[in-house]
Amino acid sequence: MTERPEQIQSRLAGLDQIGQVTSALNAIASGQSAAARGALPAISAHAATVADALAVAAALAGAGPGGGEGPGLLLIVGAAQGFSGAYPARLAEAARAALTPGTAVLAVGGRTLAALADKGVAVLWSAEQAPLPEAVPDLASRITDAILDLVGTHPGPIRALTGAADPGGAPEIATIFPPEVAPARGALPDLTLPPAELLQGLLSEALFAAVARTLMQGLAAEAQARMQAMANARNNLRERRAKMQAAWQQARQEQMTTEMIELASARPDAAAQD
């Protein structure tokens, strides 16, 4: 049964409303992506400063960052919200493939946490992703504290997995601890702290910087995934609207034809009555 033009017009209005929602979500995601990417250089600069200080502290202490033997920890920074397409599932699959027996998992992002559960990945510690770049330092501090609490019972390297820095790229995994310590440059300074104590504090700060960078990159990657999902949704809406517009025109033409036939068939009766 062909729908009436009024019914199709109502459905067209509904599609237009959905289009407005997707446009708003895309605008928000675009702003988040730009803000997160804009914050990355500052985090990298902080990490570089810590690395320079770490080189000096290691030289004075006569020791490196160390790190126990074992499977270690895996930090997964994923998606907090929906409307991000297959991004949470891709991260969960990459995490499952990267796991080794005994690895403890820390996960950030509710959507990715659910995807990890679907893949059968057990999570030891979890948190929601920062909603804005401004909230990343506080979350990075919490995660750093959680990692430091767990390294005693889960020795080994600490790796981080999140979305690619480049849009559309595969998830990226990297070892964030222990850091690589470069040789110290220039004369070594005098210290007021014991070198070993300074080294330990700088190692914690290096871990914090690496976690913050991973969180910020994950925030940008999630926003980029949402932008791609909204672009796909807009393309789908355009196709559906074009088909529905054609259906409306056909229904309207059929309605007009029916009205003309009814008018034409009514004239002889009117003439006979005269």
Task: Enumerate the predicted regions with their spans.
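N-terminal assembly/interaction segments in proteins that build large macromolecular machines
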Residues: 1-274
